[in-house]
Amino acid sequence: MTNLNEKQLITEIVGLARSQGLTVHSENAQLNETGMDFQVVFAKDDTGMPWVLRKPRRSDVVERASAEGITLAFLRANLTADVPDWRIHTPELIAYPMLKGTPAAGIDLEQKQYVWNMDHQPPSDDFVRTLADILAELHGTDQISAGQSGIEVIRPEDFRQMTADSMVDVKNKLGVSTTLWERWQKWVDDDAYWPGFSSLIHGDLHPPHILIDQNGRVTGLLDWTEAKVADPAKDFVLYQTIFGEKETARLLEYYDQAGGRIWAKMQEHISEMQAAYPVEIAKLALQTQQEEHINMALEALGVTSD
C-alpha cells in the first residue's frame, strides 16, 4: 500500500470515529493492516488518550463482531486480565481505548513472520506462568453464565462432530492429501483424545493478541472474535505451533498448577488438532474467496494446484 493510500484510509477511519463523536485526529495516527478481519488505526484524541479504531473488512466480520461485543461485556465482569472496552460499536466501526501493555509480537506482512517484543527462545518463566494463570481462569469461567450472556456454547460431542463435518466439507471443496486425511480420521474416531467437557476459550490465541508488561508478564488478551464455549485444547494449538511441544508441556504444567483442567491425552490431542489446522485455514479461504488465502489453504492441505 502506498503512503497516499495509507493516508486516505487513516483519514477515512478517523472520519468514521469523529462522526460518532470521538475527537481523534489523523495526525501521527498509524495504520495496521496485519489482521485478516479488520483494518486498524491507532489514533489519539484531544486529551492525548490513544484509541484503537477497527474497520471490518467484510460483512461476515460485522456479524461476528456482535458476538465479540457480547463476549467482551461478559469477560470484563468475569476475567481479571485486561480486555477491550468497546465505546463505539457500529457496522462500520469499532473503537476502544488502547489497553496498557505491548503485544508479545507484531507481524511483518512482507516477510510473513513475527516481529517479537519479548525473548521467545524460550519464553520467560514470567510469561508462561502468567499466560497459564489467565487461561486457567478463562477456561474455568462458569459456562452457564457465559451461555446466558449470549456466548455460543458448543457441547464436546458437537464440537467433535463439527470438526469431522468441516473436514469432509474442506475435502469436497478443496481436497486434502491422503496422509493428512487418514491422520485426521484416526484422531476424530478415537475417544481417548477428546475431552468430555467444554470451556470458554479465546479461540485465536497467538502473540499479536497477547499483551505483556515491561517484565514480560501477560496482562491482557485482544481480538476475541473467535471466542466461544468449546474445546479448551484450541487455545494451545497456535502456542505449540510457534514454541514447540516441550514449551507447550511447560505451559500445561503451569496451567495445571493454576487449576486448569487437564486430561490424559491432552497434549496428544493438541498435536492432532495442530495437524488439522489446515481445516481452519481452508474455512477462512472459503469464506474470503481470496486467491492468496485459497493458495495458502491448498498448500497446507497438501494439494497441488495445477
UniProtKB/Swiss-Prot annotation:
Q: Which UniProt keywords apply?
A: ATP-binding, Kinase, Nucleotide-binding, Transferase
InterPro entries, sorted: AGP_Transferase, Aminoglycoside_PTrfase, Kinase-like_dom_sf
Q: Does the record's keyword annotation contain Nucleotide-binding?
A: yes
Q: Which GO terms describe its molecular function?
A: ATP binding; kinase activity
The active site lies at D204 (proton acceptor)
Identify the domain of life.
Answer: Bacteria
- PANTHER family from the entry? AMINOGLYCOSIDE PHOSPHOTRANSFERASE DOMAIN-CONTAINING PROTEIN, AMINOGLYCOSIDE PHOSPHOTRANSFERASE-RELATED-RELATED
In the record, the note on similarity to other proteins reads: Belongs to the aminoglycoside phosphotransferase family.
What is the protein's given name? Uncharacterized protein YcbJ
Q: What is the lineage of its organism?
A: Bacteria, Bacillati, Bacillota, Bacilli, Bacillales
Gene field: ycbJ
